[in-house]
Amino acid sequence: METSAPAPALEKKEAKSGLLEDSSFPDPGKKACPLAVAAAVAAHGVPQQLLPAFHAPLPIDMRHQEGRYHYDPHSVHSVHGPPTLSGSPVISDISLIRLSPHPAGPGESPFSAHHPYVNPHMEHYLRSVHSSPTLSMISAARGLSPADVAHEHLKERGLFSLAAPGTNPSDYYHQMTLMASHPTPYGDLLMQSGGAASAPHLHDYLNPVDASRFSSPRVTPRLSRKRALSISPLSDASLDLQRMIRTSPNSLVAYINNSRSSSAASGSYGHLSAGALSPAFTFPHPINPVAYQQILSQQRGLGSAFGHTPPLIQPSPTFLAQQPMTLTSISTMPTQLSSSSSNCLNDANQNKQNSESAVSSTVNPITIHKRSKVKTEAEGLRPASPLGLTQEQLADLKEDLDRDDCKQEAEVVIYETNCHWADCTKEYDTQEQLVHHINNEHIHGEKKEFVCRWQACTREQKPFKAQYMLVVHMRRHTGEKPHKCTFEGCSKAYSRLENLKTHLRSHTGEKPYVCEHEGCNKAFSNASDRAKHQNRTHSNEKPYICKIPGCTKRYTDPSSLRKHVKTVHGPDAHVTKKQRNDVHVRAPLLKENGDNEASAEPGGRGPEESVEASSTSHTVEDCLHIKAIKTESSGLCQSSPGAQSSCSSEPSPLGSAPNNDSGMEMPGTGPGSLGDLTALADTCPGADTSALAAPSTGGLQLRKHMSTVHRFEQLKREKLKSLKDSCSWAGPAPHTRNTKLPPLPVNGSVLENFNNTGGGGPAGLLPSQRLPELTEVTMLSQLQERRDSSTSTMSSAYTVSRRSSGISPYFSSRRSSEASPLGGLRPHNASSADSYDPISTDASRRSSEASQCSGGGPGLLNLTPAQQYNLRAKYAAATGGPPPTPLPGLDRVSLRTRLALLDAPERALPGACPHPLGPRRGSDGPTYSHGHGHGYAGAAPAFPHEGPNSSTRRASDPVRRPDPLILPRVQRFHSTHNMNPGSLPPCADRRGLHVQSHPSVDSNLTRNAYSPRPPSINENVVMEAVAAGVDGPGLECDLGLVEDELVLPDDVVQYIKAHTGGTLDDGIRQGYPTEGTGFPENSKLPSPGLQGHRRLAAADSNMGPSAPGLGGCQLSYSPSSNLNKSNMPVQWNEVSSGTVDALPTQVKPPPFPHSNLAVVQQKPAFGQYPGYNPQSVQSSSGGLDSTQPHLQLRGAPSASRGSYTQQPRQPAAGSQCLGMSAAMSPQASYSQAHPQLSPNIVSGSLNQFSPSCSNMAAKPSHLGLPQQMEVVPNATIMNGHQREHGVPNSSLAAVSQPHPVLSYPQQDSYQQGSNLLSSHQPGFMESQQNAGFGLMQPRPPLEPNTASRHRGVRSGQQQLYARTTGQAMVTSANQETAEAMPKGPAGTMVSLAPQPSQDTGRAQDQNTLYYYGQIHMYEQNGGCPAVQPQPPQPQACSDSIQPEPLPSPGVNQVSSTVDSQLLEPPQIDFDAIMDDGDHSSLFSGALSPTLLHNLSQNSSRLTTPRNSLTLPSIPAGISNMAVGDMSSMLTSLAEESKFLNMMT
């Protein structure tokens, strides 16, 4: 899968590539006039505001004035360099620059705007995972979005500087790209004069006032060379250090400006970003006003810390949107650096801390903060992060490090003014005087002996080989650092010239050392960094062991060991060469992380360059692998990746796997600081890795190494503790530092002992009264940057593999069973973290490891959007984070409803974890209990969809008003397809949506019972309505939402207008097209998303017609409540999950064969079928094999979904309302050219219609096809032939109206349903003794034969209710279009829903014609005047039955069925998958035969189930069916993401 993002960037770049070429830019060596440049740029349409970016810099230093710098005239290598240059992370990924303009919100970075066609999650995922490793690592390391990384890459090359404040990011990137691709070295541009005046708007801190402020103008090194050529005319040989030292014994400073800024071995540019442009070239992000003021107020104090970074690099789009807590930290970070750490810092060391901060122009402030180094004389130094060597590099590194002996010495930051040379007690006022004294009197006094005689020197007077070594060594004692960085804004100084050279690479961008590991393209500014990276990333060896007695630290490289010894054990605890070279490896020890290895000293050369030389590997690994934040001295200040400094004596809860890359063993237990947890938790697999670091190799490594449950539980425990400490509303909590909270069923955790404790696992340890508090805190932690599936904004279409179910609300992958060692028998998702986010690297097959127990409290997933919003607001208020995004329609909700919804959950908890959940997929193992009493697995709480009146709806489904359908409750069993009269289990009413007009059979149920499954928006809508109208549990209410609560996304409205003649019917907007609006022949309301909730809660699929007289018409209700996909907020990747609703076998085969109403084509004329002759049935040419799923038009009196249900083997469960089951015969041979369903394809006879169903004339609604497939609504067929209950009437068949394109001779042949369907496929209807009064309620199947399980039947298919005895079916459910059908003009498979009957007495033939398990062909007929309703039979609820609420298109999903013989039949929800947006690109053609033809009997991702239906191809514009290819799905993400974002 290749991202589509680079293409637009490339095209735009190429389109603009001629800009500079044609603009008379100077040749190398010439200097272009600023006016000429401006004119040239303006001539090409480049906004003038970009011109300030072309600073005319002042001369950099004397080298430029003397002309000793020779600039490489060749161009910056274009987008992708030669293979040998693949290691260069600089230009190779410029193609990923996001060039399209994005309007930036008032408070967000211009780069934070989402790509118009790519969801931000998707963008991060695609850009990072599918870009080169280098880009990914850099992106993750620096906390930048891919676009920011590209920006930084260019910045590293010194290709640009600050853009004017109002610069459009798109134009800015255009400029950068052009500059990168143009052959002229833009260093010349930087040489122009007047640079300071070009940015008058900038603060003086940002203005180029000093020549040294500018980075080297050299555009790029010779990328083809491993080591770049020296940029100085001097060669190595010409630089005589001995001569320099002897000539100027006091210092080498005089030679710095005249010497090379990098050696010949310097190579490519520095790991920290060559962009390290000084503040003059700041990042053009809009800066948070507060943070900006803080930075300006600390110009010089913190200037060094941000010397090469913009005042504040705003986080990437998802970082802003998803990381409220971290964002808060960032916005206050400068203050934290200076004040929060005040307990560890003093003013004297402020600059030192800053100078030791990561000197990276691309380092995210979080990382910078994390790496801030505190060096004080009185306090221990901050621990350094270990960086490692590969075993192969040990020898080379050893040689490198031993080049001079002084390297092995730990360096102390001191300022000595008194001489402690042996027998010398002189005192001086300044350090310079002391240095002069030592060099002249002591060192040069002993011409032949180079021995340090400083008192207490650890070398013990071991002589040096050369005098310069002694001179350098003495700097350890005096604290002299003569080698200062000459770049403006950088206050780095080093005692060793080599360290300075290494540091300068961070400014110049040289990275000559490329990782030698195959497939890794990372480059580093020094060999030590590369060795550390290789050992940390590609190896796990830690050969360097601290020899200090009692210390068991192990490190991957000597520099980390030195750092550790120096900072932890003190400067005098010298690391001897023996210690350094000891490579005997001891067994890794999991212990406390004594020193924060993340802020490692990257520069292998010398301790003082610890952070400067740090490379991109450090940024990644430091950000992602800091498992513990603990210093071995309580006085030490430890900053965290969350940009919050904290001093902690305990390690972070994030333990580390043995293979962690931190360079040392990380602690496995112990809480850390809130700041640490803030970022770490957000980068955990369950969370958005786009938060702290863009998804990248680093993120993958993080997940790989931190995926154990233990770490997650520790993390959440600590975060929970911190939140409880900081949030008063969370309830009092012990404030002791070492409080150990038991594991909670929180995001990313699995109660390991759940199987053994039977629901009383670790969570059970908590007092029951405390559990709600803890749960609420947990919910808050989840809410801080998570949205539940009900508000998911991400599509997982591109995760069409089996690991795609990362978005799945139930479990994230086929490995989901790993997440449920709990042994539950029903799927359920209590974790919002793994509900979606496919784009993050976390949405993998492993993400299911973050499963949770099914109970434990009113979890986040139990809340309505309003309640979640309320919690988010509380959380933000408690943590100081930004307020949550207001709900889309909350302001329109009535006050009463709003007040009711905003109440925090106060439900009684059924238990800590009442029952575990089981694998989501049938392939993960049987998860159905057939014998636990009523079919419930133990004490497992009923799911929301098990409540009779609740139902799920995808988050993307627009909120629609439900009809005030008052339906009786039905008893749901674990295996629900058979309906028996009975009462609901106490927990059946999960959501408490008692929508009844008659006494409730379970009025004692609590309305707010805990549900382990995330409430869909549909449920939330109903809950909101209930909250507005119900005063107590068990009360009956009308589900009709007030009109102003209906919220339709703008694009949906526009779409509807576009396809309905520009007018949006009010009835449609309300979800209720009036009967009179009956959709005309060509009227197509294509927006599946519009069609209403996925089974609005009131019309829960689980509610069988339990009202007296309703039962007779239930058509093959065989959905399993257990794996009820339609009840799940199915995400895109449900498609690939291959799950199917396992429908247990029917109680008994009915005596009658299951005849199907032949679905035949009729003229598009919509409602006039009074005279259809039942004998004109089209017979299927091949008949339907008994093993073949058949379309079952479930038209019951209230056929909420007369649906073509794929029922592989459904014993006829009775003769009542067999449901017009249209068998789709795959053998049907029909002309592909005709986009209509051939009568041959679907043929059969509605054989068994109960009297209550006799009125059900299956009227065709206009499918999205040019010729709509229609079921003949012949009243005579319905009534005349089905007069007798339970008598198979083969004559009942939908007749085929002549169609111009029918190419099948057998148009008039009468076909018995028995011919089409063998007796092996008896209808699942159970015969009822009462024609109209039998209550159908699900009963556990009597025979567990999987072969007879229903495949396509979904619980989503509402029970069919007769509004009145003789009335045609009233199915407002019909108002949903098949979501699998695109919303194109001819693309709606369903011509929109039948209008709910406003008059309960009116006959309403609104039958949704579903091809259930495969493609939902919704047949909806407004009113069919020709239908002759049978005289109404007395029914208890004839008048109270309202049309069922509009089910969302997701109700009946086309599911990828697995072998009907073997697997538990889960289903893939095509409806939900195709739920929103114009997915025309997602479908290869309406009901493309290629999709449905020759399908495997095994689960086939997006392909529909087995060969049950072959349909003619549709013209290109009418693509309706999903094609299982990744590319088409990716292209559809634009609409999907756009719509989802609008919905959320």
Curated annotation (Swiss-Prot):
Pfam families listed in its UniProt record: zf-C2H2 (PF00096), zf-C2H2_15 (PF23561)
Biased composition (Polar residues): 790-800, 805-814, 997-1009, 1173-1190, 1200-1209
Gene Ontology molecular function: chromatin binding; chromatin DNA binding; DNA-binding transcription activator activity, RNA polymerase II-specific; DNA-binding transcription factor activity; promoter-specific chromatin binding; RNA polymerase II cis-regulatory region sequence-specific DNA binding; sequence-specific DNA binding; transcription cis-regulatory region binding
Keywords of the record: Acetylation, Activator, Cell projection, Cilium, Cytoplasm, Developmental protein, DNA-binding, Metal-binding, Nucleus, Phosphoprotein, Repeat, Repressor, Transcription, Transcription regulation, Zinc, Zinc-finger
Basic and acidic residues bias (residue ranges): 569-585, 954-963
Zinc finger region(s), C2H2-type: 417-444, 455-477, 483-507, 513-538, 544-569
Start and end residues of each stretch annotated as Disordered: 1-26, 338-364, 557-619, 635-682, 781-800, 805-861, 908-963, 995-1016, 1166-1220, 1422-1457
Residues that bear Phosphothreonine: 708
Phenotypic effect of disruption: Full embryonic lethality. Homozygous embryos are detected at the expected Mendelian rate up to about 18.5 dpc, but there are no live pups. Mutant embryos present important craniofacial defects, including defects of the medial portion of the frontal and parietal skull bones, absence of upper and/or lower incisors, often combined with a cleft palate. Besides, mutant embryos show defects in the ossification of skeletal bones and shortened limb bones.
Biased composition (Low complexity): 637-657
Transmembrane as UniProt keyword: no
InterPro entries in the record: GLI-like, Znf-C2H2_ZIC1-5/GLI1-3-like, Znf_C2H2_sf, Znf_C2H2_type
Entry's family note: Belongs to the GLI C2H2-type zinc-finger protein family.
Subunit architecture: Interacts with ZIC1 and ZIC2. Interacts with STK36. Interacts with SUFU; this inhibits transcriptional activation mediated by GLI2. Interacts (via C-terminal internal region) with FOXC1 (via N-terminus); this interaction is direct and increases GLI2 DNA-binding and transcriptional activity through a smoothened (SMO)-independent Hedgehog (Hh) signaling pathway.
Protein name in the entry: Zinc finger protein GLI2
Originating species: Mus musculus (Mouse)
Gene label: Gli2
